[in-house]
Amino acid sequence: MILHVVLFRPRAGLEEGQRQDLAKAFASAIDNISAIKRARIGRRRTHGRAYEQLMRVDYTYAAILEFEDLAGLRAYLEHPAHTELGARFFDCFEQALMYDFDVYDGHVGLNTLLEEEL
């Protein structure tokens, strides 16, 4: 499985209409791109732990999309609904990180820590 992880902070002064357009573009991607197996989008939660203070950037939101394989991720990235989402997204964020990860369930995933490349 591949996770497409996006951490982002909207730019200051983002208008309500722009937020709504971004949410609609996310919804359209989720509804129209069958390669997305699961989508989770939410706001950062803090609860007073020391590690929260160590973060250099406060990313307010996360979007985590799951794909069965690389072909699914590529289908998502090349889909017109993603193109529209990207246009809205890049117009709205102040800072963002985007990563793709191969992930495995349970102990199988731990084996990746044993690989040479850390």
Residue ranges and their predicted role:
Residues L70-V103:
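C-terminal structural segments of small proteins and small subunits
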Residues M1-Y61, E68-A75, D102-L118:
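Short S/T/G/P-rich N-terminal loop/turn motif that feeds into the first structured element of a domain
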